[in-house]
């Protein structure tokens, strides 16, 4: 007898000890042992009294009918005992129940029509199972579609789920604001009964009371909620919850009082005003205006994955959910015909670029706090809530900062902001997509050139890493698009008084330099209309310059330029050949028979001007030598050959950007040589490491001392790690070399022009003898770099597909390493 008393006391003490351990921080091994002991203790107490569980689960009666049923079933259950006799335990032991919430949560329980027994279990209500469920569009989901949940399929609709059961984890209910078994709508339109708990501003949904990890974990801060009352054909009250960064959640509740109670708790947790709770007067946050512009559509295509926590769920585009939903049983022909139309009108998540603020967990004094974070003007601002009424801490300047992912087993999506190695802040996102979005935002604002693929993501699987990288690249691209440089074709012309640079850093020839003093002495017209008409736009249809206008022709008739041109034409031989065609452009300044005449022209010709060609893509000018406005004059045969050569070389250099091309070729060549030299060094180091590895393996085979053997194995592991690192660096180097080679080929082929090139073919193929033309009968000169010339220009950028194999290999290596 004493043995049984000692065993009973041992079990009691063990139960108390396990409860004490629940309050302690234990290691993973200790947690496993504790859970094993708790399970053994539960099994022992359950097997020692088989009728205890039944009596306990049916002791709470609502009316006399249920009480009579329980009394009728009790003898039948006792008759099934192995020994044919009732058990020794006649009454159920007192089990610890979860703490009740504050009294303010249940003021309206007194208004219930059906009187209920006042008991602690009465607080946890449950939704009655439904026979059929109707979607928002009135289509009944086929009842033949079986649920994926075995418990729902076997027990869900046969008997109500009593709470709490003896195996229920009371730990789940600790510090909970409200909890109950509710119906939750799945993405196929079916309903699943789950244990819903609101704790620490989060909604937790458990598949059953035995589970320790929630199937759904959503932060309710900033979320909106709508109460949809029970309709005629429906059997449930609905609460539609729209979180900030998760899918829409629909909960089914049994009574209006329960729905209003949950609505009030969710509104208190979310921090939103309660005025917009009723349907039709919904309070929608700013972020939802971008993401959910059609709330009714969003409810139709709910997505709550049953294969993992939806904290890391990736929201699907409405059209994909539409296809999944319409493919269920009982769909109509009209729905199939409308699938294509819905795809065309569905909203793409393009507004993602506008989301520069959301809730993040911030590490403050070794504690994680939820803060509303916003990126604005290269600063990261922290607020207590989304209303931005109270600043949580001082803004953080992002200029020059580094953003480094810092995942841990407990915080997979955490990252740090560093400045010169010093940690300024540590943040945590709620999903892989949100983490990637914020990485891209912070990298863009800090001005960092780091590729998101270069980061190391420990404790994160390959799928989530790819999601983080793709989201980061997407936000980077959208931020670059948002803050891109102004486009001249859209933003209009630049200001007139701005100093514009030359197209290229090309040294002009001595001939052009000799004309510059005359340009300085030239009186520039102040009329803005003349300035506007002086530009020849390369991407438009060629128009006449103001030099060909009647007013300008009259103004130039009395200028010394025409007298110089007349002198030049009179000095030419009488049997001059046919002049150039009107398609040929005006060439350089009129040259006489000798250099002395050219020098004498300089002080006498103050009206010579350098025409400019406006390139809209980069808002730059190309300087050309003075050209004749109304007459086409070629270089006379008696002119010195060096003048012609300098003329052609200068034009070619201006056209091709010779100095820039040579500089790019030189730079890429040096970069290629440097990378190849580094590659050879890595190869030599790898060969040496492999040699040492072979020698170590041979030594390991011959070694018999255990201590020496352990040290050799450790050294071998270190060499293996070093080999992997060197191999990874070699792969990166190969990719860099491939990129440099491609750039070098492009540079050698010619400069990557800015959408235009200066065509000087006409300058080199000028007829040796000009035709003297009077100003009255001057033909129209086609502007240089006209649109027709540009169409015939060959492509200077060749798209290549090389290097993809190495790129794929690198991606697979990174996925394998993670």
UniProtKB/Swiss-Prot annotation:
The gene is AFAP1L2. This is Actin filament-associated protein 1-like 2. It comes from the Eukaryota. Residues 652-749 form a coiled coil. Interacts with SRC. Interacts with LCK when tyrosine phosphorylated. It holds the Pfam family PH. One of its GO terms (biological process) is positive regulation of epidermal growth factor receptor signaling pathway. The lineage of its organism: Eukaryota, Metazoa, Chordata, Craniata, Vertebrata. Keywords: Coiled coil, Cytoplasm, Phosphoprotein, Repeat. Residues 85-94 have a biased composition (Polar residues). Gene3D superfamilies: Pleckstrin-homology domain (PH domain)/Phosphotyrosine-binding domain (PTB). It is found in: Cytoplasm. GO terms for molecular function: protein tyrosine kinase activator activity; SH2 domain binding; SH3 domain binding. May play a role in a signaling cascade by enhancing the kinase activity of SRC. Contributes to SRC-regulated transcription activation. Residues 123-139 have a biased composition (Acidic residues). Residues 66-163, 513-532, 765-787 are annotated as: Disordered. The modification Phosphotyrosine is found at residues 56, 413. GO terms for cellular component: cytoplasm; cytosol; plasma membrane. It comes from Homo sapiens (Human). Tyrosine phosphorylated (by SRC). InterPro entries: AFAP (IPR030113), PH-like_dom_sf (IPR011993), PH_domain (IPR001849). Detected in spleen and thyroid, and at lower levels in kidney, brain, lung and pancreas.
């Amino acid at each position: 007898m004493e043995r049984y008393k000692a065993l009973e006391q041992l079990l009691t003490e063990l139960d108390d000890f396990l409860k004490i351990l629940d309050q302690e921080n234990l290691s993973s091994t200790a947690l496993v042992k504790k859970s094993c002991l708790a399970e053994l203790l539960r099994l022992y107490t359950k097997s020692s009294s088989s009728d205890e569980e039944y009596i306990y689960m049916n002791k709470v009666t609502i009316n006399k009918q249920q009480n009579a049923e329980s009394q009728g079933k009790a003898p039948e259950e006792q008759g099934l005992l192995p020994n044919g006799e009732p058990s020794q335990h006649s009454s159920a032991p007192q089990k610890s129940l979860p703490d009740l919430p504050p009294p303010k949560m249940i003021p309206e329980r007194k208004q219930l029509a059906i009187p209920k027994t006042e008991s602690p279990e009465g607080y946890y209500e449950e939704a009655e199972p439904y026979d059929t469920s109707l979607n928002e569009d009135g289509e009944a989901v086929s009842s033949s579609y079986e649920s994926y949940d075995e418990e729902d399929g076997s027990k869900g609709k046969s008997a109500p789920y009593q709470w709490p059961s003896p195996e229920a984890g009371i730990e789940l209910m600790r510090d909970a604001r409200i909890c109950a078994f509710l119906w939750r709508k799945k993405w196929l339109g079916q309903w699943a009964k789950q244990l819903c708990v609101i704790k620490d501003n989060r909604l937790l949904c458990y598949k059953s009371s035995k589970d320790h990890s929630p199937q759904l974990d959503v932060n309710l801060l900033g979320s909106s909620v709508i109460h949809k009352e029970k309709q005629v054909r429906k059997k449930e009250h609905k609460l539609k919850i729209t979180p900030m960064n998760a899918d829409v959640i629909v909960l089914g509740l049994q009574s209006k009082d329960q729905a209003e109670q949950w609505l009030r708790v969710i509104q208190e947790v979310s921090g939103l005003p309660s005025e917009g709770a009723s349907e039709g007067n919904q309070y929608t946050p700013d972020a939802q205006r971008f993401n959910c512009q059609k709330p009714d559509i969003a409810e139709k295509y709910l997505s709550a994955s049953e294969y993992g926590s939806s904290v890391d769920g990736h929201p699907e585009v409405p059209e994909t959910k539409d296809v999944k939903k319409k493919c269920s049983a009982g769909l109509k022909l009209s729905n199939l015909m409308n699938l294509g139309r819905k795809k065309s009108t569905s909203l793409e998540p393009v507004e993602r670029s506008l989301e520069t603020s959301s809730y993040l967990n911030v590490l403050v004094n070794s504690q994680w706090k939820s803060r509303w974070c916003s990126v604005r003007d290269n600063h990261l601002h922290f607020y207590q809530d989304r209303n931005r009424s109270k600043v949580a801490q001082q803004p953080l300047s992002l200029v020059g900062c580094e953003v480094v992912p810092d995942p841990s087993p407990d915080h997979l999506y955490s990252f740090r902001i560093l400045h010169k190695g010093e940690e300024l802040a540590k943040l945590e996102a709620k999903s892989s997509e949100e983490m990637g979005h914020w990485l891209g935002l912070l990298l863009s604002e800090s001005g960092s050139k780091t590729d998101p693929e270069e980061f190391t993501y420990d404790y994160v699987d390959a799928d989530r890493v790819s999601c983080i990288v793709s989201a980061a690249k997407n936000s980077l691209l959208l931020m670059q698009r948002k803050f891109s440089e102004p486009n001249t074709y859209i933003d209009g012309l630049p200001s007139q008084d701005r100093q514009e640079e030359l197209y290229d850093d090309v040294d002009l020839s001595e001939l052009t330099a000799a004309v510059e003093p005359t340009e300085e002495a030239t009186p520039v017209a102040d009329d803005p209309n003349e300035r506007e008409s002086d530009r020849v736009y390369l991407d438009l249809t060629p128009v006449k310059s103001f030099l060909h206008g009647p007013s300008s022709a009259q103004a130039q008739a009395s200028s010394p330029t025409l007298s110089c041109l007349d002198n030049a034409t009179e000095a030419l031989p009488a049997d001059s050949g046919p002049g150039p065609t009107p398609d040929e452009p005006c060439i350089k300044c009129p040259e006489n028979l000798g250099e002395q005449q050219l020098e004498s022209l300089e002080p006498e010709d103050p009206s010579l001007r350098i025409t400019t060609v406006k390139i809209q893509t980069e808002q730059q000018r190309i300087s050309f030598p003075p050209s004749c406005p109304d007459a086409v004059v070629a270089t006379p045969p008696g002119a010195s050959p060096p003048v012609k050569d300098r003329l052609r070389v200068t034009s070619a250099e201006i056209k091709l950007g010779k100095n820039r091309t040579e500089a790019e070729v030189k730079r890429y060549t040096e970069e290629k040589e440097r990378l190849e030299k580094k590659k050879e060094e890595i190869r030599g180091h790898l060969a040496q490491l492999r040699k040492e590895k072979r020698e170590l393996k041979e030594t390991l085979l011959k070694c018999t001392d255990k201590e020496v053997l352990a040290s050799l194995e450790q050294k071998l592991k270190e060499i293996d790690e070093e080999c992997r690192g060197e191999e990874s660096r070699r792969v990166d180097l190969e990719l860099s070399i491939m990129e440099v080679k491609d750039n070098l080929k492009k540079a050698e082929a010619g400069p990557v022009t800015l959408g235009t090139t200066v065509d000087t073919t006409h300058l080199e193929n000028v007829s040796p003898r000009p035709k003297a033309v009077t100003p009255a009968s001057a033909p129209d000169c086609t502007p240089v770099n006209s649109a027709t010339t540009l169409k015939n220009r060959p492509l200077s950028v060749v798209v290549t597909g090389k290097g993809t194999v190495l790129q794929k290999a690198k991606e697979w290596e990174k996925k394998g390493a993670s």
